[in-house]
Regions:
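Short aromatic/hydrophobic-glycine micro-motifs
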Residues: 38, 60, 122-126, 213
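Charged, often glycine-rich, active-site loop that binds/positions anionic groups
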Residues: 51-71, 137-147, 230-232
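Active-site acidic/histidine clusters and adjacent loop/turn architecture
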Residues: 1-44
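Anion (oxyanion) recognition and catalysis
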Residues: 34, 119, 209
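Primary recognition of N-terminal secretory signal peptides and signal-anchoring hydrophobic helices
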Residues: 165-236
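Extended, low-complexity, intrinsically disordered C-terminal regulatory tails
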Residues: 30-64
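Catalytic cores and adjacent binding grooves of peptidoglycan-active enzymes
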Residues: 70-172
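Soluble non-cytosolic domains of exported or imported proteins
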Residues: 16-24, 46-49, 104-112, 197-202
């Protein structure tokens, strides 16, 4: 059986280019699915406009079956906000789109187990669409329409934070498997962190709040910024 690290590595190339929050969510989905005995592979992440147009032509002006109704610019894949998945088979190299498969033999179809975890994280599922059902497709719109995205709009910091909050509970469970430590600022405990290989990890927001600083996430730059607030009477 493949290790979690091996399963994650198989999807690494296709996760490249995704919006940071979608990347975190897709990674969490791989981890949660693996934990219940359903390893998955991300088969598609970011898709360029040209690649989308070529896919749209399939079954229309090019050989093959129709697999999408979206032209270039009309898919969340084109903005790094969508990912497609398949079930990774026990041999570690083959995949399956069999929605009736129950490899972990728990009475629930593996495909739907993955979908349940995906929705809990905040993904929208293409299988819920009423017209063209796209069962491998998962996306996060962050409240933005495709028309919004075509004009250059980006997910807001608040929308991104909401996704992070949905992922956090499972991350905190994983945190407890490491060496738990109390993090203090000026003698006052502000949070529980964890120690791994000599490095202490703690939520940046807890540190900034304890220091009376402001914290902001800038999606376009994929940057978390902590800004200290000068004390009254301080000389700068």
């Amino acid at each position: 059986m493949l290790t979690l690290a091996q399963v994650l590595n198989k999807s690494a190339a296709r996760l490249s280019g995704l919006h940071p929050a979608v990347l975190a969510a897709a990674t969490a989905l791989i981890e949660r699915s693996y934990a219940v005995g359903v390893p998955i592979l991300i088969t598609q992440g970011l898709r360029t406009i040209a690649e989308q147009d070529a896919l749209y032509a399939q079954g229309r002006t090019r050989p093959g079956a129709i697999v999408t109704n979206a032209r270039g610019g009309y898919s969340y894949h084109n903005y790094g906000l969508a990912a497609d998945f398949a079930l990774l088979l026990p041999d570690g190299s083959s995949v399956s789109w069999d929605m009736n498969r129950d490899e972990n033999q728990n009475g629930t179809r593996d495909w739907l187990e993955v979908v349940q975890h995906a929705k809990a994280i905040g993904f929208e599922w293409g299988g819920d669409w009423t017209s063209f059902k796209d069962y491998p497709h998962l996306q996060m719109s962050f409240g933005l329409s495709l028309a919004d995205l075509r004009t250059g709009k980006k997910p807001t910091a608040a929308a991104v934070e909401a996704v992070v909050e949905r992922i956090k509970p499972k991350e905190e469970q994983a945190m407890r498997t490491q060496m738990k430590v109390a993090v203090q600022v000026n003698g006052r405990k502000i949070a529980d962190g964890w120690l791994e290989n000599g490095v202490t990890y703690v939520p940046a927001r807890k540190i900034s709040e304890a220091l009376g600083a402001q914290i902001a996430y800038h999606p376009a730059a994929n940057t978390v910024e902590i800004t200290t607030i000068p004390q009254k009477g301080a000389i700068s």
